[in-house]
Amino acid sequence: MRMLFRSFLATEAAGGIILIAAAAAAMLVANSPLAPTYFELLHARLGPLSLLHWINDALMALFFLLVGLEIKREFLRGHLARWSDRILPCIAAAAGMAAPALLYLAFAGGTEGLVRGWAIPTATDIAFAIGVLALLGSRAPASLKLFLTTIAIVDDMGAVAIIALAYTAAISGPALLAAIVILAAMAGLGRIGVRRLWPYLLLAAALWLAVLLSGVHATIAGVLAALAIPLGDEDDSPLERLEHGLHPWVAFAIVPLFGFANAGVSFAEIGAEQLLAPLPLGIAAGLFLGKQAGIFGSVRLAVALGLAQRPAGASWTQLYGVALLCGIGFTMSLFIGGLAFSDPLLIDEVKIGVLGGSILSAIAGYALLRWTGKVT
């Protein structure tokens, strides 16, 4: 289990650095002579969907499949298997989602049509955050990395629930019934002891199509499929084999491709009025101010009330640095922004807010942790 966790951190750290590079490349291309080609390519039709929709609806389903696998493993056999281990990350993640949402509504809630974006600043990008933390090397104790990872995993659970409940279109009964039948078939395979992966993967593909047609966002199929893939007591369970095989593809290909496809925003026609509009301000404030206030404040309160203990080997200053890093929303924030709004102008404002809040959080968190001494 320790080797699996170390491998996970290493993959997330390297993947996070590649994600940062992909986002930077997207912004450079979007503000270069290649910009028309970049945007035309993203909106080119490939069968029933555009390239951008294939990335966001199909490839990101694999990202959510991995998220589901990680959540299931952590809660059944990992660092969240005991209730005592869940208390602090759950409190921190819950407060770290509520505070940004409230701050967003304070900035943007009064503007017509913007309430739908309340969930955008609630997310934490684990790959991006771990990538920044990895740059600190030994200055970041293992307990700090574990704390950040567990918060992000619980945060992902909240994000999945929000996507399923708040951003679902009109429901198609027959397609939803088909999805339920397929999911039951996957669970049945586990009950009768099927350990080969291919039957689960075939049914997972059918589940994705059924969920897509049902009106629920197709990426939720990834999480549902993960819950049906068995995690036994053996070290080579179907879940662990799939997680191990999927991790490099998601970390080094799918998430960077998503970042490159979604982070590109042209600043040619963006002025101070758009930068200071309620939507980007609400998102940036939610990520940079709301996340740190919600997470750090709730952790201090939980420890003071005796509900949980401070992570061993980490100072309060270091925990505040982690709270800052949790304001890096990026992947999930951009994803939710695409679900909340369809107007290209609003999508650009979402990108500005997410990039602004995430960059501020990354710089502030890194700087604080970089200059933080050892715990005494």
Curated annotation (Swiss-Prot):
Subcellular location: Cell inner membrane
Main localization of the protein described in the UniProt heading: membrane
Keywords per UniProt: Antiport, Cell inner membrane, Cell membrane, Ion transport, Membrane, Sodium, Sodium transport, Transmembrane, Transmembrane helix, Transport
Pfam family, one: Na_H_antiport_1
Topology in the lipid bilayer: Multi-pass membrane protein
Any one GO biological process: regulation of pH
InterPro entries, per the entry: Na/H_antiporter_dom_sf (IPR023171), NhaA (IPR004670)
GO molecular function: sodium:proton antiporter activity
Catalytic activity: Na(+)(in) + 2 H(+)(out) = Na(+)(out) + 2 H(+)(in)
Spans traversing the lipid bilayer: 8-28, 49-69, 87-107, 117-137, 140-160, 162-182, 209-229, 248-268, 270-290, 321-341, 349-369
Leader peptide range in chain numbering: none
GO cellular component: plasma membrane
PANTHER family per the UniProt record, alphabetical: NA(+)_H(+) ANTIPORTER NHAA, SODIUM ION/PROTON ANTIPORTER NHAA-RELATED
Family per record: Belongs to the NhaA Na(+)/H(+) (TC 2.A.33) antiporter family.
HAMAP family: NhaA
Job description of the protein: Na(+)/H(+) antiporter that extrudes sodium in exchange for external protons.
Protein name in the entry: Na(+)/H(+) antiporter NhaA
Provenance organism: Rhizorhabdus wittichii (strain DSM 6014 / CCUG 31198 / JCM 15750 / NBRC 105917 / EY 4224 / RW1) (Sphingomonas wittichii)
Source taxonomy: Bacteria, Pseudomonadati, Pseudomonadota, Alphaproteobacteria, Sphingomonadales
Gene name, Swiss-Prot/TrEMBL: nhaA
